[in-house]
A protein has these predicted regions:
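N-terminal binding-site loop/beta-alpha segment at the start of enzyme catalytic domains
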Residues: 1-92, 158
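N-terminal small/glycine-rich loop or linker at the start of catalytic domains
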Residues: 19-37, 95-108, 131, 136
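Ser/Thr-centric signal marking residues that sit
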Residues: 58, 62, 96, 144, ...
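Residue-level signal for alpha-helical context at structural boundaries
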Residues: 94-95, 153
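Glycine/proline-rich, positively charged
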Residues: 101-161
Length: 161
């Protein structure tokens, strides 16, 4: 039998509304910046996720370039999701983001529509998911009009990703 979350996981964690949305964030989130790359130990990653969720931490925060190597944190967490957390997907708040270097060429970072949509599509593949709950633009782009960046994010939300 696989992982079974503690029944008491929601007994002590406090949750706060995320802005004016219907989402509620736990007081503590688990971020995967340099903790879940290929240089880490998979069993430790899995244990961290289990312990976090067993204590009411439902928000798991990633980015397309978290690792090292780029994308490896999403891939490793995607495997943990598949192994342990798919039965609990509706209880999880999974976020990822894009904006920093990810691949070579003029569309490998920043905030163009092309980069953001391609980044999210790649993130979803690595995570093994059809959607994320929050997709952030990681930083301002001095060369792309804000309207283009915001339009891309709006399109992503409307597409259900």
């Amino acid at each position: 039998m696989g992982y079974m979350a503690k029944e008491s996981r929601y007994d002590t964690m406090q949750y706060n509304r995320c802005g004016a949305s219907g989402l509620k964030l736990p007081m503590v989130s688990l971020g995967f910046w340099h903790n879940f790359g290929d240089t880490g130990h998979y069993d430790n990653m899995k244990a961290m996720c289990r312990t976090a969720f067993d204590h009411g931490i439902t928000h798991f925060d990633l980015a397309n370039n978290y690792g090292p190597a780029y994308g490896s944190a999403e891939r490793n967490f995607g495997q943990i999701l598949k192994d342990d957390f798919l039965p609990y997907r509706d209880e999880l708040l999974i976020s990822t983001k894009a904006g920093y270097d990810m691949w070579e060429g003029p569309y490998g970072n920043w905030g163009s529509r092309k980069y953001l949509i391609a980044s999210l599509d790649q993130s979803l593949k690595r995570l093994g998911l059809e959607y994320v709950d929050i997709f952030y633009h990681h930083r301002m782009d001095p060369e792309t009009p804000l309207e283009e960046t915001m339009g891309a994010l709006d399109s992503i939300v409307k597409s259900g990703k």
